[in-house]
C-alpha cells in the first residue's frame, strides 16, 4: 500500500497548522484536513480572541520562520500585575528581574496568527491543505492508517494527528476516555481602546465571579477576558453599548483613563478536559483534543504549541533514522513527554480558579497574603516567571529556538 501522505492532520486550527508547517518544512509529506473554509477563518468575526504567546512559544514561531510575519502586530508583555479584587497587596512580575531583555511574552490576535500560519502552509510544496472537508473516520492497522474524507476520498498515512478540538471525533472514535467538567463560568471577550498607554503591562484582577484580565495590544488597545457567572454572561453580552461600557468600566477601573469598547463581543463557555491517553494505534492527540484548561493563566495555546514541538521533533528524528513515524514506541514517548506538563498546568489553573473565584473572607486573607509573600521571595518569583515563559523542564528543540 502506498501512502497518500506520511502524516495526516485532522484539524486546521492554530495547532494543526503549526504541526503541518513544522513537519512539511522538514520535508515530510503532510495532508491537513479541515472542515472550515480557509477564507472564513481570516474574517474578523471568526474568532475574537487574542492569545498570550509565551517566550518559549515565540521561539517555536521564530525557529519555523513565522515570527517576522507576526512581530509587527504582537505587543510585548513587559510586566504582569496580579491582584485579588481591589486588594492593596498584589503580585508584580517584571521582565527586568530575569536580567534579560526578552519580554515575558506577547499578546497577539488569533486572526494574525492564523493569517501567518495559513500563508506559510500554502507556500510549502509537501503540505496539501484539504478544506473544507472532514475526516469521517480512520481505520488503523499495525502498518498504516486510512482516513475516509467527507468527499468520498480515502487517504492513507503512517500517522494521524488529531488536532480536531475539545470534542475531538477521532479521540472518541478511538475510545480514549476523558476526565472533564464544565465550570459555571463564561468568558466574555472584547477589545477596548483606552486614553492612557498601557506600557506593556498585563493586569489580572481576581473577582468573586472569576478573573478579569486586561491584556496589552498594539495601538493603545487591550484585550479583555472577563470571566463571569454563566447565568449572567448572556445578559451582559446583550446589553446596549453604553450599558455594557458602564459594566466594563466598573470592573476595569480608571488607571488607563477613559475606556471605550471597540469591535464585537464574544462569549466562550469554560471547561476542563484531560484525555486519559494521548495516543492510540497510529494516532496522536495534540492541543485541545488532548487537554482544555481554564484561561486563568493564559496558557492554553502555549500548552498546545509545546505538544506540536515535541511531536514534530519525534516524527522528524524518526524519519531521518528511517523509522516508522507511527510506531507505538515513538507515540508512547510523545505521551510520556507531554502528559505531565498538561496535568500539572490543568491542576494549577483549576486550583487557582477555585481559590480566587469566591468572596469567602478567610480564604481571601490567605490568598492575599500568599500573593504578597511570593512577591517578596525573589527565587520563587523568578522560577514562576520562567515557568510562565515556557522555558522550564525538558524542552523540545523548537522551544529552545533550534531548528528541527
Residue ranges and their predicted role:
Residues 45-85:
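N-terminal FAD cofactor-binding segment of flavoenzymes
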Residues 2-4, 62, 73-173, 181-186, ...:
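Conserved N-terminal helical subregion
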Residues 5-32:
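N-terminal Rossmann-like FAD-binding beta1-loop-alpha1 element of flavoenzymes
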Residues 15, 38, 167:
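Conserved Rossmann-like nucleotide-cofactor binding loop
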Residues 24-49:
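Glycine-rich FAD pyrophosphate-binding loop
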